[in-house]
Each structure stands twice: as structure tokens, then as C-alpha cells.
Swiss-Prot record:
This is Putative manganese efflux pump MntP. It is found in: Cell inner membrane. The chain crosses the membrane at residues 6-26, 36-56, 61-81, 108-128, 138-158, 169-189. It comes from Phocaeicola vulgatus (strain ATCC 8482 / DSM 1447 / JCM 5826 / CCUG 4940 / NBRC 14291 / NCTC 11154). Its main location: membrane. It comes from the Bacteria. Keywords: Cell inner membrane, Cell membrane, Ion transport, Manganese, Membrane, Transmembrane, Transmembrane helix, Transport. InterPro entries: Mntp/YtaF, Put_MntP. The gene is mntP. Probably functions as a manganese efflux pump. One of its GO terms (molecular function) is manganese ion transmembrane transporter activity. One of its GO terms (cellular component) is plasma membrane. Belongs to the MntP (TC 9.B.29) family. It is a multi-pass membrane protein.
Length: 190
């Protein structure tokens, strides 16, 4: 793979992180750099580590992973999306979806990085055959996801302040749509 192809791949993998970060920023409605960097760190970390795991396990476990990875991603995103929709109709004191909580961030990071696991498996079949040859792609993927997630959070805060239209409802729908997209891609388009 060329460097340009790796950057384009990194940008495309970061789009789910970007969307989830926008959703989180919308819910927060204020700039909280610490939270944004923690979220971006975990998104970048999981986007970088998953291809490494996929690449490493490609020859041994690919048949086990590919049968249900999309269901895991869908389930996690649908769960958090459903909670957000439910919470959009409840009192603010009773809301559980909190993008500042580590459990929420890690769950979303795992869900949005399942595709990166599949990319790692494909790396094993396109001539990336040593740790030194996969190091550059995973660093680029992780860095890109970090930067794009941070930008998404900022965009979300801006949108959340300008539009006060049950943003948790819309954010929950976005998470469910991402989950459905992943499911459709794996069930019908692969």
C-alpha cells in the first residue's frame, strides 16, 4: 500500500469516530479539552491497536472473527444509541449516557474500531508481513482518528449550542444508523 492509500484509509476509518465525537460534543455543549482528549485518545488507541490485532491474528483466527464482528459493533452502538434516545425523554438528573464517563468512551471506541480489525486482517494479505511494515499504518490510523475525533467534538459543541433540538435523540439515532451501516456492509456488501 502506498502512503497516500494509508492516509485515505485512516481518514475513512476515522469517520465513525468523527460522528460519535460530534454526537458527544453536541450533548456536552461546552468545550472540555480534557474530555475531548480522553475520548480522542481512546478512539485513536483502539483504531491503531485493532488493525495490529487483526493483522497478527489473520492467519489463525480470521474465520472466527469475521462471522460476528459486525454484530458486536451493531449491538454496542444500538445499545448506546437506544439509551441516548430513551434519556432524551427523561430528566437531566437521570441520564446515563455521559460522554465524560470512561465506560462509555471505551465502549464507543471498541464499537467504532471493529472495522479497523478487519482492515488489519486485510493488511496480512497485501504484503504487510512484519511488525516494522505495519508500524507506519497503525501510527497514521491512530493519529488520524485522534485528530478527527477532537475536531468532531468541537464541531459538536458548536452545533449543540446553536441548535437546541433534543440533541441526545438525534445523537442516539446517529449511533444506531452507524451500527446498521456496519451491519449492512458486512452482511450484504462484502
Amino acid at each position: 500500500m502506498t502512503t497516500l492509500e494509508i492516509w485515505l484509509l485512516a481518514i475513512s476509518l476515522a469517520m465513525d469516530c468523527f460522528t460519535v465525537s460530534i454526537t458527544s460534543g453536541i450533548i456536552m455543549r461546552r468545550i472540555c479539552w480534557r474530555t475531548f482528549f480522553i475520548m480522542a485518545f481512546f478512539f485513536g488507541l483502539f483504531q491503531a491497536v485493532m488493525p495490529l490485532i487483526g493483522w497478527f491474528a489473520a492467519s489463525r483466527f480470521s474465520h472466527l472473527i469475521e462471522d460476528y464482528d459486525h454484530w458486536i459493533a451493531f449491538g454496542l452502538l444500538a445499545f448506546w444509541g437506544g439509551r441516548m434516545i430513551k434519556e432524551s425523554f427523561s430528566n437531566e438528573d437521570k441520564r446515563c449516557f455521559d460522554p465524560t464517563k470512561l465506560k462509555v468512551v471505551v465502549t464507543l471506541a471498541i464499537a467504532t474500531s471493529i472495522d479497523a480489525l478487519a482492515i488489519g486482517i486485510s493488511f496480512a494479505f497485501v504484503g504487510i508481513n512484519s511488525f516494522t511494515s505495519i508500524l507506519s499504518p497503525i501510527v497514521i490510523i491512530g493519529f488520524t482518528s485522534f485528530v478527527i475525533s477532537t475536531l468532531g467534538s468541537l464541531i459538536g459543541v458548536f452545533c449543540g449550542k446553536r441548535f437546541n433540538l433534543r440533541m441526545e435523540l438525534w445523537g442516539g439515532l446517529v449511533l444506531i444508523i452507524i451500527g446498521v451501516k456496519i451491519l449492512i456492509e458486512h452482511l450484504f456488501l462484502s
